[in-house]
A protein has these predicted regions:
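An alpha-helical appendage that flanks or caps ligand/catalytic pockets
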Residues: 27-28, 125-166, 196-304
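Active-site mouth loops of central-metabolism enzymes
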Residues: 5-17, 77-87, 167-178, 233-249
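Alpha-helix C-terminal capping segments
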Residues: 63-71, 97-100
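Hydrophobic faces of well-ordered beta-strands that scaffold small-molecule active sites
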Residues: 3-7, 34-36, 74-77, 104-108, ...
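Internal, glycine-rich beta/alpha segment that forms the wall or movable "lid"
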Residues: 18, 42-49, 76, 82-189, ...
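N-terminal beta1-alpha1-beta2 module of alpha/beta enzyme domains
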Residues: 1-68, 171, 271, 277-296
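Active-site beta-loop-alpha junctions enriched in small/polar residues
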Residues: 8-10, 39-41, 79-81, 109-111, ...
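Catalytic domains of carbohydrate-active enzymes, especially glycoside hydrolases
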Residues: 20-37, 188, 192, 255-266
Length: 304
């Protein structure tokens, strides 16, 4: 199992200096990738976790990190596809892939925040058809010299887009979702699945099996799939319902449980630690705490 970490995009540690510092530190320590996430806004009176109160745009933050790193992969988990045109995202993703030397991974979800749907004038439904058409437009623009698409929800007149991504097939696409139909869709259509931050260990273990079974039923090799999990770390205090909690040995043991469940990449996302990614977190203290955790959990014991 590969070990990655979250990019500083939320709260106290999401500053230009700390983003560069921790991107470089993660690369030096051997982490596989850096992952960001999307949150456009929070509605007045809307109940949201502290991590969502102040969030950098993921594509811009990853571009900033790309310019200051050389080897580490750069991913977003996830962009909510109803919020942005597939043509715009195809251009952004291809540009980031080119500028990073082919290091970009694209996670896509369908969204869940009603204020964001209203503010972007979007509708997630029908989720299945929307996702499938969206993927078709992305891949056509990335791979075809002249791309065209005429769907129920998206239309693309004959057109060309350049530059193309580094990979001939475009950046790897991972799909989110927790419903069985979404899990099966990831197994059928995507490079893999990326889990929700709110998913329990049991839900993730079950999701792995559904995704793999769907891939096999579609004639794909399930061992080729990537299963990426956002790990919310609780350093210090042990909670039985949080595998990545407790002392360093307990957190590492929890990570091993994910590996045994079939997860191929786990990223420690410290944005979810309120002392690091919370809106009121002190930047200096957040940086000290994050550096301690990232250094202590460096992936020396995990290999490809």
């Amino acid at each position: 199992m590969l070990i990655s970490c979250g990019l500083p995009v939320s709260g106290g540690w999401a500053s230009p200096a700390l983003l560069v510092r921790f991107a470089a530190l993660a690369e030096d320590l051997g982490y596989r990738g850096l992952w960001a996430f999307q949150r456009l806004l929070v509605g007045v009176g809307q109940e949201m976790a502290p991590v969502y109160q102040s969030v950098l745009d993921p594509m811009i933050a990853l571009s900033y990190a790309a310019a200051r790193t050389e080897r580490i992969r750069l991913g977003v988990a996830v962009i909510n596809l109803p919020y942005v045109s597939p043509v715009v995202l195809a251009k952004q993703a291809a540009s980031l892939d080119v500028l990073s030397g082919g290091r970009f991974d694209l996670g896509l979800g369908t969204g869940w925040s009603e204020p964001e749907f209203v503010a972007t004038g979007s509708d997630p439904n029908p989720r299945g058809r929307r996702t499938e058409e969206y993927l078709a437009v992305l891949r056509a623009l990335w791979t075809d010299q002249v791309a065209a698409f005429d769907g129920d929800l998206y239309q693309l007149p004959p057109a060309s887009m350049a530059p193309k991504p580094i990979s001939p097939s475009g950046p790897p696409i991972l799909l989110g979702g927790t419903a069985d139909v979404a899990l099966r869709r990831a197994g059928r259509l995507a490079a893999g699945w990326v889990s929700s931050s709110r998913a329990s260990f049991d839900a993730i273990a079950r999701g792995v099996q559904i995704v793999r079974r769907a891939a096999e039923e579609s004639g794909r090799d399930p061992d080729d799939l990537r299963i990426v999990v956002r790990g919310t770390v609780q350093a210090g205090e042990r909670s039985d319902d949080r595998p990545l909690s407790g002392d360093w040995a307990q957190i590492r043991a929890g990570a091993e449980r994910y590996a045994q469940a079939g997860v191929t990449e786990l990223f420690y996302d410290l944005n979810w630690d309120p002392l690091i990614g919370g809106p009121d977190a002190d930047p200096a203290r957040a940086a000290d705490r994050a550096a301690e955790i990232i250094t202590a959990l460096a992936p020396a014991d995990f290999t490809e």
